């Protein structure tokens, strides 16, 4: 069976990319011929460095022959149109990035309906005539695409995402557990000799809200903070520089910023740390939180979105915060009560294993065909 998998780009290697790779692995186990369709060429050397145990597709089609740098706002609509044309060549089509790519497919994964959410425009779009001219056609395209955005099955990863999809798309989504490589991260959980250290992990992107972590670190000079972040484009690099500037401005000796580290290095850091902090607000899920928990770190997350509602279950399996003072208090509690909180975190993480996702997705595909 020929199956097409559509994803914006694997290069960021965030949670959505791990879902895409797990989908490919599941399809390969079913002996399907898998074609990955992306907007830009995949940097496989980078992807394999960050996740060595991946299964590549049989073929890859890059709609753009060069990396995305300009006009990406508009190019995603062109990519959706092209995938709509290409899907005719497949027996089954899967869109693993339905959040921002409204391309019709038999199966659509959507963390959160980002592209359909009504938000206030950034200041530059209504203060600058040039930006107004640039942005108006996008708003028109955005309003047109929901008409043709169809699927047989719509999947999401949290109650938070399910409720948002219901609100913005008036559609019912099926909740699927996020695929997390529990086995690999759980190796780190056996080490009990750990530092009073807080780890954050995710791409260097503004929505990760690392400024908040820097502010918290100012109040906890006796605790080390490490931010492990990926940089795959100029935008991420710019945000990294902003955070690095803050750390330097505050002269924080207890904050370390790492970029594009290997999975081996990441797990080694986890094995010697006690707390995993997640500062993003209204994150639809947060795969990094589960990875940290599997490695034996106590989660301390913002009281919003999937991490708070679906992963730590509003304090049952970790701690939360809504302010800097509350974050400081939660980190101190997590370190003080580390042994007992660690056990809860590890047990909770086991419910999100990649193998469980693969088996469930294989059953879903077999029932669909």
Q: What would you call each of these model-derived segments?
A:
Residues 224-242, 259:
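Glycosyltransferase donor-sugar binding loop
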Residues 268-273, 361:
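Short alpha-helical donor nucleotide-sugar binding micro-motif in glycosyltransferases
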Residues 298-302, 312:
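Short hydrophobic beta-strand element within catalytic cores of glycosyltransferases
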Residues 126-154, 160-163:
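Membrane-proximal helix-turn-helix segments that form the acceptor-binding/catalytic region
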Residues 240-261:
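Nucleotide-activated donor-binding/catalytic signature segment of Leloir-type glycosyltransferases, i.e.
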Residues 322, 336-367:
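A charged, aromatic-enriched C-terminal amphipathic alpha-helix characteristic of glycosyltransferases
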Residues 281:
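Aromatic "clamp/platform" in nucleotide-sugar-dependent glycosyltransferases that forms part
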Residues 18-22, 205-219, 238-239:
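A conserved mid-protein helix/loop that constitutes part of the nucleotide-sugar donor-binding site
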């Amino acid at each position: 069976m020929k199956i097409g998998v559509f994803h914006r780009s694997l290069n960021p290697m965030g949670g959505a990319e791990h879902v895409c790779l797990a989908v490919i692995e599941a399809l390969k186990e079913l002996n399907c011929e898998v074609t990955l369709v992306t907007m830009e060429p995949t940097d496989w050397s980078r992807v394999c460095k960050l996740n060595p145990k991946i299964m590549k597709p049989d073929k890859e089609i890059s709609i753009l022959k060069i990396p995305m740098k300009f006009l990406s706002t508009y190019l995603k609509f062109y990519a959706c149109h092209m995938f709509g044309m290409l899907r005719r060549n497949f027996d089954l089509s899967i869109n693993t990035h339905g959040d921002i790519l409204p391309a019709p497919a038999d199966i659509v994964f959507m963390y959160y309906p980002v592209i359909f959410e009504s938000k206030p425009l950034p200041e530059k779009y209504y203060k600058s005539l040039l930006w107004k001219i640039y942005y108006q056609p996008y708003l028109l395209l955005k309003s047109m695409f929901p008409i043709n955005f169809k699927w047989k099955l719509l999947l999401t990863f949290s109650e938070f995402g399910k409720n948002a999809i219901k609100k913005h798309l008036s559609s019912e989504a099926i909740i699927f557990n996020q695929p997390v490589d529990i086995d690999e991260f759980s190796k780190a959980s056996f080490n009990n000799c750990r530092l009073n250290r807080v780890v954050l992990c995710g791409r260097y992107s503004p929505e990760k809200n690392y400024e908040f972590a820097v502010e918290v670190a100012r109040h906890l000079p006796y605790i080390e903070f490490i931010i492990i972040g990926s940089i795959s484009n100029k935008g991420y690099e710019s945000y990294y520089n902003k955070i690095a500037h803050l750390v330097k401005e505050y002269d924080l000796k207890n904050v370390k910023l790492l970029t594009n580290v290997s999975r081996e290095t990441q797990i080694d850091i986890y094995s010697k740390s006690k707390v995993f902090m997640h500062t993003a607000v209204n994150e639809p899920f947060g795969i990094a939180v589960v990875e940290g928990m599997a490695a034996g770190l106590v989660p301390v997350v913002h009281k919003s979105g999937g991490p708070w509602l679906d992963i730590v279950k509003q304090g049952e399996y970790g701690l939360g915060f809504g302010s800097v003072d509350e974050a400081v208090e939660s980190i101190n509690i997590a370190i003080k009560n580390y042994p007992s909180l660690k056990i809860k975190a590890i047990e909770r993480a086991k419910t999100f294993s990649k193998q469980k996702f693969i088996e469930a997705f294989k059953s879903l595909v077999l029932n669909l065909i």
